[in-house]
Amino acid sequence: MKKALLVVSFGTSYHETREKTIDICEDKIKNSLKSHDFFRAYTSNMIINKIKKRDGIEIDNPIQALDKIYEQGYDEVIIQTLHIICGEEFNKLKEQVDGYSSKFKKIVLGRPLLTHIEDYQEAVEAIKHQIPHMESNEAVVFMGHGTLHESHSAYPALEYMLRDNGINAYVGTVEGYPEIEHVIRRLKEGNIKTVNLMPFMLVAGDHAINDMAGDEEDSWKTILEENGFNVRVHLKGLGENSYIQDKFVRHAVKCAENAKFYGIGAGPGDGSLLTIKAVN
């Protein structure tokens, strides 16, 4: 039986950060499932088009990759996402994958980084390894991408668990809630003087480089400094954290072992799984 492994991420057009994040995650997952042939897909058509125009390199979107896998006669497909939450991008991918359920003997989709409580706990433990020692008047501020999808609650849930584990952390988002002004109000209420600014994104790409750490007047760094905070920028994506990389590997392996199609909702039989349908 021919088996394929498809690793899906939002993608990035930054070579160096891709090599430190997406490429390493892909390699680790590939090495954990050596019986499967590897394929890659990005969900961002904007990034796909930019790379094609700039570098002459063609990267498939999920539909193109699945069509290619089907045309090459594969029987089984394991898909592992590198998305952070079960947001719009992941749910779009989930719907796309569901459309191929009748074309393969087995097609399974691994969950994003943050899905159920255990994921948050493991992510917090991983994050501890990248947070510097902080004084009582210091905090870490994470910039998440954010979403208008109902999964936006993942961000305050993450912050709650970080703080419950003794990490003086605040989580804001570029899109959705909470935004930087909400974070600043709470930083002032907490008498914070120094902010360690980090992206809560797989890669330190455009949002992190420009919206978070840029020198423009609307960047988080500039806004925080104008509000009187001493800002230390840590331009390192989650995908550079080896513990986060290994977390995605565990999701892929568990996905392969359980042969479940992951989505949002309680899974039958095993409460640790989130499924929308089981695929034979």
Q: For the regions a protein language model found, what residue spans apply to each?
A:
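Glycine-rich, flexible N-terminal cofactor/catalytic loop recognition
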Residues: 259-280
